[in-house]
């Protein structure tokens, strides 16, 4: 082939640059230009349906790509002095060697370390085990696949971050329309409008706010057994759903957290064998404007839930059929907040706690036709001034002049007139 001064490829065909050959000044608008080991392409401009593929051992220099043009760099291939413009896509792993610039700045991949790439329009980077990527931007249809470690990733609308088992991510930001799928480990993630699905991985210090959704233990199709989140913060506009696995420690301020029932919810999902139950442990604080809804059957005995003024805790037993419903919790502190106990048509409701203390209200919702004096009782240590309100299914008040009176033995309380 030799060295060409000017080439135009727009016919959709495939052209190969073989060992020892050099092609220069190519305008690639349709079709593929493949640079094999020992081959070299210089000053290639890739747009439209054009695709420049640099195979292992091949070299590309001064490549420009944009407007739907694609550059693929295989493991062991080299592409230097790249210029990426709007609409371009690059596909590679951390075994490639590249450097260049795009509208957001400069980027490089060398010796297993990637920094600064802009991945969009189907572009993707595969971070291999033992390798690292930092400051990656994911936009429309851009993907980052992590078996190694990554940090400071920004996922914008249409972008997707995937962290596989053994992979780790830290200090990532998921904006509106962005997606984070986690099966490895993550820390200090900010969900600022996007979605995060923990698929049996572990995350810590995740912040959920501004219309974003966090899901633990599911991708919407299957439940995953070993998922865990620690020190979760759910702020105004944020929503967290626990479908399977463990939530340990949370602060909820203006957001909503839902622990789904492990027995009746998710019945349309494929369930992993020996999947973990839905479990809440550690310290949970519900601040002003916060709500937590817990499905019946979730494991709560190792939790301490504090409900501040303006916060609402809902224990939902509406799926339980029959006359009796028992709610089992660790510790509940009512600091001016409300505890709702939701039942179907139960005539006897029991709340089992280690400790129930503070000042606040318990609101019991039922469609039962009759309310007896022993309609509700509490087993466990009870202290403070706790009033009780009973409503029907539409939350119309049936009786509100009631309070919990601690038993003389100090290990329970019963319903008494206020």
UniProtKB/Swiss-Prot annotation:
Coiled-coil spans in chain: none
Kindly state a single biological-process term from the GO annotations of this entry: DNA damage response
Alphabetized Gene3D superfamilies for the sequence: 2.160.20.20
What the record says about disrupting the gene is: No change in cell adhesion or biofilm formation. Increased biofilm formation.
Q: Which domain of life is it from?
A: Bacteria
Q: What is this protein called?
A: Protein YdhQ
């Amino acid at each position: 082939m030799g060295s060409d001064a000017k080439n135009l490829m727009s016919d959709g065909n495939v052209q190969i640059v073989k060992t020892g050959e050099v092609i220069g000044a190519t305008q690639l608008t349709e079709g593929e230009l493949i640079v094999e080991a020992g081959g070299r392409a210089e000053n290639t401009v890739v747009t439209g349906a054009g695709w420049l593929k640099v195979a292992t051992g091949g070299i590309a220099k001064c490549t420009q790509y944009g407007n739907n043009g694609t550059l693929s760099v295989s493991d062991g291939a080299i592409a230097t002095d790249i210029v990426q413009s709007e609409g371009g896509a690059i596909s590679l792993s951390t075994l490639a060697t590249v450097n260049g610039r795009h509208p957001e700045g400069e980027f490089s991949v060398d010796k297993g370390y990637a920094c600064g790439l802009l991945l969009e329009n189907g572009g993707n980077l595969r971070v291999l085990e033992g390798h690292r990527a930092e400051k990656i931007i994911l936009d429309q249809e851009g993907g980052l696949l992590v078996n190694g470690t990554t940090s400071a990733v920004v996922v914008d609308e249409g972008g997707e971050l995937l962290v596989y088992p053994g992979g780790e991510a830290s200090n990532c930001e998921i904006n509106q329309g962005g997606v984070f799928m986690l099966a490895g480990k993550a820390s200090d993630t900010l969900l600022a409008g996007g979605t995060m699905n923990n698929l049996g991985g572990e995350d810590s210090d995740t912040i959920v706010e501004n219309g974003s959704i966090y899901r633990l233990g599911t991708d919407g199709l299957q439940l995953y057994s070993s998922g865990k989140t620690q020190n979760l913060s759910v702020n105004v506009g944020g929503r967290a759903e626990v479908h399977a696995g463990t939530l340990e420690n949370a602060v909820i301020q203006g957001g909503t957290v839902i622990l789904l029932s492990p027995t009746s919810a998710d019945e349309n999902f494929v369930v992993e064998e020996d999947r973990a139950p839905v479990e809440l442990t550690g310290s949970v604080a519900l601040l002003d404007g916060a709500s937590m809804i817990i499905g019946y059957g979730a494991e709560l005995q190792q939790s301490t839930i504090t409900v501040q003024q303006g916060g609402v805790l809902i224990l939902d037993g509406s799926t339980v059929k029959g006359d009796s419903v028992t709610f089992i919790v660790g510790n509940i502190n009512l600091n001016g907040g409300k505890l709702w106990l939701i039942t179907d048509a139960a005539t006897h409701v029991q709340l089992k706690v280690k400790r129930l203390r503070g000042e606040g209200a318990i609101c019991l919702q039922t469609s039962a036709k009759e309310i007896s004096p022993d309609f509700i009782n509490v087993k466990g240590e009870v202290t403070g001034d706790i009033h009780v309100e009973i409503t029907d299914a539409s939350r119309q008040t049936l009786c509100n002049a009631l309070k919990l009176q601690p038993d003389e033995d100090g290990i329970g309380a019963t319903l008494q007139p206020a």
